[in-house]
Amino acid sequence: MEAQNIFLYLLIVFLSLHFVFTTLKGRLSPANTRRLIRLLHIPIKSPVAAAIFARKDTREFLDSSIKLVNEEDDFGFSFDFKPYMISKAETINRALDEAIPLIEPLNIHKAMRYAILAGGKRVRPILCLAACELVGGEERLAIQAACAVEMIHTMSLIKDDLPCMDNDDLRRGKPTTHKVFGESVAILSGGALLALAFEHLTEADVSSKKMVRAVKELAKSIGTKGLVAGQAKDLSSEGLEQNDVGLEDLEYIHVHKTGSLLEASAVIGAVIGGGTEKEIEKVRNFARCIGLLFQVVDDILDETKSSEELGKTAGKDKVAGKLTYPKVIGVEKSKEFVEKLKRDAREHLQGFDSDKVKPLIALTNFIANRNH
């Protein structure tokens, strides 16, 4: 009976809001129309569907990803990271769900939602929120920025999986976006996520000075000084023999293709949180370390894990002849490099509040110890 009452209540609310929307639609500005559409979206999607998604898919995904971070590491550090990460991921998932309603063009929005709500560790948006709080800011100030970097990241995955790029059929254990919706819709949905990311970022409640800097950081991270440069170098290096390349080539690819957006995520969080120039620079150097760390671990996993364990096609880098750390220096030396990057990352966090720094240290351990 209680469930029926809840259903009737939601139905009444929805019909009432729908009447208001259809009555006022022609009289509203585009910005207010968009807000009203999102309001109509909330009763059906956010409290029910998004909450169920956040508790089920995200928890299951993180349960299988988080290992060792709740125990003491080699430095004697201990932090209960799992509830922290799940809480942040749920906040981000709800915000993403509200940001991308099921409206026309329906097939594009379905593809956008399929790609971005398909699970995932949410490392970049969590890094953005943690960096904001590290320098004394509030989570609410950085939530739009956190969503923006995840939209950009998802766009990059859609493009990366296309037949003309890495030609992958699996992502997060599910068929890739172009396999479900077709290449043309996948490309359009990626472009839509890119545009929406900047639109969403500009809705953050911060000063124009901080906003301009945040937009610049994000744009730089995905252009020819960031992600695009790394992807171009990655593609041009396919099939080269080990003697034809060096560590500097490999580091260039990883720092730009993977590290640039991780760096931007942290820096934008610190900027929005009101960090000093010295604090922002320390956060930037920390993020550069974990950006490279993330990709080195990715290279190791691609070499040592199965497709079932990874949730994506295993061994594809080796088959494609891509440059990876195991290919250039071997698996064991790659693991040693992981430990060095962990130490370097921690050093850049010295001088910050000991409690506020804990999530970032735990995130570093999570990235290093993840199994997919």
Curated annotation (Swiss-Prot):
* Cleavable signal peptide: 1-22
Q: Which reaction does it catalyse?
A: isopentenyl diphosphate + dimethylallyl diphosphate = (2E)-geranyl diphosphate + diphosphate; isopentenyl diphosphate + (2E)-geranyl diphosphate = (2E,6E)-farnesyl diphosphate + diphosphate; isopentenyl diphosphate + (2E,6E)-farnesyl diphosphate = (2E,6E,10E)-geranylgeranyl diphosphate + diphosphate
Pfam families named in the record: polyprenyl_synt
Give GO terms for biological process. carotenoid biosynthetic process; farnesyl diphosphate biosynthetic process; geranyl diphosphate biosynthetic process; geranylgeranyl diphosphate biosynthetic process; isoprenoid biosynthetic process
Q: Where found in the cell?
A: Endoplasmic reticulum
Question: Which positions does UniProt annotate for dimethylallyl diphosphate binding?
Answer: 171, 257-258, 295, 312, 322
Q: Which cofactor does it need?
A: Mg(2+)
Instruction: Tell me which Gene3D superfamilies the record gives.
Output: Farnesyl Diphosphate Synthase (1.10.600.10)
What pathway is this protein a component of? Answer: Isoprenoid biosynthesis; farnesyl diphosphate biosynthesis; farnesyl diphosphate from geranyl diphosphate and isopentenyl diphosphate: step 1/1; Isoprenoid biosynthesis; geranyl diphosphate biosynthesis; geranyl diphosphate from dimethylallyl diphosphate and isopentenyl diphosphate: step 1/1; Isoprenoid biosynthesis; geranylgeranyl diphosphate biosynthesis; geranylgeranyl diphosphate from farnesyl diphosphate and isopentenyl diphosphate: step 1/1
The residues that the entry says bind isopentenyl diphosphate are: 121, 124, 153, 172
Q: How is the cofactor bound?
A: Binds 2 Mg(2+) ions per subunit.
EC numbers on record: 2.5.1.-, 2.5.1.10, 2.5.1.1, 2.5.1.29
The UniProt record gives the binding positions of Mg(2+) 1 as 160, 166
Task: Provide the tissue specificity.
Answer: Faintly expressed in flowers. Expressed in roots and siliques.
Q: Which GO terms describe its cellular component?
A: endoplasmic reticulum
Q: What family is it from?
A: Belongs to the FPP/GGPP synthase family.
Physiological role: Catalyzes the trans-addition of the three molecules of isopentenyl diphosphate (IPP) onto dimethylallyl diphosphate (DMAPP) to form geranylgeranyl diphosphate.
NCBIfam families in the record = FPPsyn
Which PANTHER family does the record cross-reference, listed alphabetically? FARNESYL DIPHOSPHATE SYNTHASE, GERANYLGERANYL PYROPHOSPHATE SYNTHASE 4
Protein name as annotated: Geranylgeranyl pyrophosphate synthase 4
List the source organism: Arabidopsis thaliana (Mouse-ear cress)
